[in-house]
Amino acid sequence: MRPFQSLLLLVCSALLGSCANSRFTTTPPAWAFWKPNRFDRHGRETGRWRTYYDDQKKQPYTAGRYRHGRPVQTFRYYDPTGKPDRSETYRQDGYCEVSYWHPGGQLARRGPAQWVTGPGKAPRFYWYGTWTSYEPNGQISAVQIYADGTLTRAETYKDGQLTEVEVFEHNWRSRVETYSNGQLLKVETFEKGLRVGTTSTL
């Protein structure tokens, strides 16, 4: 075989190999980055994500974004009729503010939560801090306080007035205070959910 024929064969082989390898490249084309519901090379959700109640993708269920398998910015959830059900606005380190909505679009409940995930960690989503519930007219109906996902205190309101306070210890109700027109009427104490004492304040 002549030298120039050997060189030509070598060049052709290189070109064919390059074309073959380009079909199996790990880098997707630029347009693929705009497609929703993608995974990165580690199998983690990334970019825009959309899920639906139906196979025809006419009834949205969730809409949001992921980065390295963690939700970022604002995730929105919808009920089967298409109305907003709740939203989760994420900040750094998995902290987020969660809002629930009445069917009419008014704020129903809001409070902080945290999404914990990472290497060697089981994914966990829990509430903490103060959660406030509202009537459709905007009046407060309840205030609950959570510590690491566990309810520690619950306040109930009627027409904007405090009516009851419940205190919890180790997932057991330990104390109940009853109010009327802002005045404390009665205090009940509990041990492991069983009432052990009642005190009237009148």
Briefly describe each language-model feature range:
Residues 1-8:
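Bacterial N-terminal signal peptides that target proteins for export
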Residues 8-15:
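Bacterial N-terminal signal peptides
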